[in-house]
Amino acid sequence: MAQNDIGIDLGTTTIIIAQEGQGVVLNQPSVVAVDTRKNSVLEVGDKALAMVGRTPNYISAIFPLKDGVISDHTMTRELICRFVNQVYSSHMVKPRVAVCVPAAITGIESDAVVEAVVAAGARQVYLIDEPIAAALGSGIDITIPDGRMIIDIGGGTTDIAVLSLGGKVKATSVRVAGNHYDEEILKHVRNKFSIAIGQRTAEELKKKVACCPQKTDFNEMMEIKGRSLLTGLPVRVNVSTSDLYEPVMMLSEQIGTAAHQVLEKTPPELAGDIYRNGVVLTGGGAQLHGLTEYLSQELKVEVTVSPDPVNCVALGTAMSLGLGDKLETGFTDATPRIGRR
């Protein structure tokens, strides 16, 4: 693998870039701040995120990725170009780039990813399915005949796959993930407490307070501030773990059902491997309190969290460039699609 080759986890909420041997070299929010009067980009990443909810009307914060795929091609190209240029100098040889994508991505959606990465200066582009990247980045050897199951819960999608001999045996992708927890918590707080809160407050509640009820020893409380829907004035309320059970379980059950369906379709020998090896959770959503307990109960197997759930997809994506000949499915040289070599 060349020194400047990179792997990109093109996430709905965060873009992470890694290089094998160096680890994560960039971790930035997937957001662009745009001056709509001039149609010009002001900031990207952390600086753009700091503007969300605190800007004049003519400054718009754009999240150009939705549910794991590109929804705004121009802004995604801008993000990737700026971030890639941060990690390698313009005088260096153009990098080979591997990008992870949802397992159920369509041809049109994957073409959009490739076009954006080539516009950023890549000389060759490879696409790798997220569950495969997550397994590699978690230190799992998927090239041997031993069934492993990955549940990767990102910002926009949850990818579930059974892997063996370098490829996918069974897989599915559901559009239930971290952002959806934020949205449901925001709506639930609005309905239960008659208070309007922002997306960042909802995310903080998810990380610090939310929990599946199967984890009986967890009970936290957090004071939040927002705007009263009754008076229109600033107000503060305390939200407890039990207050959030309803939205948390509604979404967790959808992930559990999807995982159950994948297991039901898994060949018996591989199902036995999974019973022995357990299931590994990856992605930022894997850190939800009580989720391992709930999924263990639902799937009747041990469920554990990857040693580095947030970064493992990017790390595995970077690793894939040196393992391409050992990956049977889910790893594709996508450069020819757009006539580039």
Regions found by a protein language model. Give the residues of each.
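Nucleotide/phosphate-binding catalytic cleft detector across ATP-hydrolyzing
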Residues: 1-153, 161-279, 286-341
